[in-house]
């Protein structure tokens, strides 16, 4: 039986179609989830994709974190369901308190659209276990509010527990400690600002490195 991966759509979501395609290429059955859904339809994992949900009003991700679908995601994540937050999805996961820290305006206050080189720091999560620790991957990034920040105690905890998953080699947005992605205590929830779903096919991406995150999830579900 194929892994069932749910992909959420909020008003203002942009990258749900690409995330769904990436999951399908990885061999998953994709289930579309609407922001007003309370029923997760039996999915094994959830992707919270990028975009500008609710127009980024109040704060990026703040309104989406209160949506009915996210209340169900929070409940199931507490039971171990793998969750991936990409860009705006990462922002939503921090607002929902599924991940610590906050994503704030980039240094220089500019929107950046670049192909980002990342170093894999943790390859034991549900979304990175087909990668190698220390491996460099290339996936696109596009955001104006992707500067990861947290208090010193939280940063020390993330570093000490090995919960930094990805680091930028060229820290264009000013994130603390070059952090591009993190995980929770269990390694089942991962958030990152760059877009792995845009790097799954040679025709359209700078690489196919992003596909590994979806393959990892499919393998985790099957295990």
From Swiss-Prot:
One GO CC term on file: cytoplasm
Compartment annotation: Cytoplasm
Alphabetized CDD domains for the sequence: GATase1_FGAR_AT (cd01740)
Matching InterPro entries: Class_I_gatase-like, PRibForGlyAmidine_synth_PurQ
Pathway recorded for this protein: Purine metabolism; IMP biosynthesis via de novo pathway; 5-amino-1-(5-phospho-D-ribosyl)imidazole from N(2)-formyl-N(1)-(5-phospho-D-ribosyl)glycinamide: step 1/2
Catalytic activity: N(2)-formyl-N(1)-(5-phospho-beta-D-ribosyl)glycinamide + L-glutamine + ATP + H2O = 2-formamido-N(1)-(5-O-phospho-beta-D-ribosyl)acetamidine + L-glutamate + ADP + phosphate + H(+); L-glutamine + H2O = L-glutamate + NH4(+)
Keywords tagged on the record: ATP-binding, Cytoplasm, Glutamine amidotransferase, Hydrolase, Ligase, Nucleotide-binding, Purine biosynthesis
GO terms, biological process: 'de novo' IMP biosynthetic process
Main location: cytoplasm
Active site per database record: 87, 195, 197
Recorded GO MF terms: ATP binding; glutaminase activity; phosphoribosylformylglycinamidine synthase activity
Quaternary structure annotation from Swiss-Prot or TrEMBL: Part of the FGAM synthase complex composed of 1 PurL, 1 PurQ and 2 PurS subunits.
Function noted in UniProt: Part of the phosphoribosylformylglycinamidine synthase complex involved in the purines biosynthetic pathway. Catalyzes the ATP-dependent conversion of formylglycinamide ribonucleotide (FGAR) and glutamine to yield formylglycinamidine ribonucleotide (FGAM) and glutamate. The FGAM synthase complex is composed of three subunits. PurQ produces an ammonia molecule by converting glutamine to glutamate. PurL transfers the ammonia molecule to FGAR to form FGAM in an ATP-dependent manner.
Protein name: Phosphoribosylformylglycinamidine synthase subunit PurQ
Annotated organism of origin: Corynebacterium glutamicum (strain ATCC 13032 / DSM 20300 / JCM 1318 / BCRC 11384 / CCUG 27702 / LMG 3730 / NBRC 12168 / NCIMB 10025 / NRRL B-2784 / 534)
Gene: purQ
């Amino acid at each position: 039986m194929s892994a069932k991966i749910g992909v959420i759509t909020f008003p203002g979501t942009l990258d749900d179609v690409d995330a769904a395609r990436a999951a399908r290429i990885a061999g998953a059955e994709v289930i579309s989830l609407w922001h007003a859904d309370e029923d997760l339809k039996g999915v094994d994992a959830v992707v919270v994709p990028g975009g500008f949900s609710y127009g980024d009003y109040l704060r990026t991700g703040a309104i989406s974190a209160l949506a009915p679908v996210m209340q169900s995601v929070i409940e199931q994540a507490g039971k171990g369901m793998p969750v991936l937050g990409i860009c705006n999805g990462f922002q939503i996961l921090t607002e929902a308190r599924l991940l610590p820290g906050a994503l704030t305006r980039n240094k220089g206050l500019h929107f950046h659209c670049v192909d980002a080189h990342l170093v894999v720091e943790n390859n034991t999560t549900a979304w990175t276990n087909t990668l190698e620790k220390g491996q460099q991957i290339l996936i696109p990034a596009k955001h104006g509010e992707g500067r990861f920040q947290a208090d010193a105690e939280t940063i020390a905890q993330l570093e000490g527990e090995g919960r930094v998953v990805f680091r930028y080699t060229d820290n264009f947005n000013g994130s603390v400690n070059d952090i591009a992605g993190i995980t929770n205590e269990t390694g089942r929830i991962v958030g990152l600002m760059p877009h792995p779903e845009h790097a799954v096919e040679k025709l359209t991406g700078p690489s196919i490195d992003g596909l590994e995150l979806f393959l990892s999830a499919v393998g985790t579900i099957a295990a």
